[in-house]
Amino acid sequence: MKTTAKRTVYYQYPVELVWRGIGIGSDETTVDPLNEEQYENTEPDRGTVFTRAIEVKQNEVFHFRMKTWLFYSEWRIELSPVGPCETKVKFTNTIEYRSLRGFFYTGFGNLARSEVKAFSRQLGQKIEADFQKNRPAPEN
């Protein structure tokens, strides 16, 4: 069973700030990468998630796969500058359930939609916090 959710959000920030909010190139991001063979041959336990980047183009695309004990998930996040201070972000999340149990356990197929909605909202909050933190002090 597969479900797909798509959502387009406009953020009132430049594309570089949105990209940093996603976490790519951030000082906070730590990764222990798996190669393709390790990813395919490793099975996650409960509470474990394995992630594999498929395509990463700075300020444009972040495409990755996730594997949990219940489902496989494929995310594609596409960024497009609309102007100097606005960015269009298209989120696509496709979830393939590993069993009927996973389908029921995660809300009868509603997981893709709720994940896209939550991720886009959290990204907006993270971008705003980063903007406020790095905002130049007003001149007196």
What function would you assign to each model-found segment?
Residues 68-125, 129, 134-140:
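Beta-strand/loop substructures that line and gate deep hydrophobic ligand-binding cavities in soluble
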Residues 38-45, 62-68:
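Short beta-strand segments that buttress and anchor functional surface loops
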Residues 18-28, 53, 62-64, 89-91, ...:
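Hydrophobic pocket/interface hotspot
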Residues 34-36, 56-63:
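Short Pro/Gly-enriched beta-strand edge/turn motifs at strand-loop
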Residues 12-16, 54-59, 78-88:
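A short, structured loop/turn motif at beta-sheet edges
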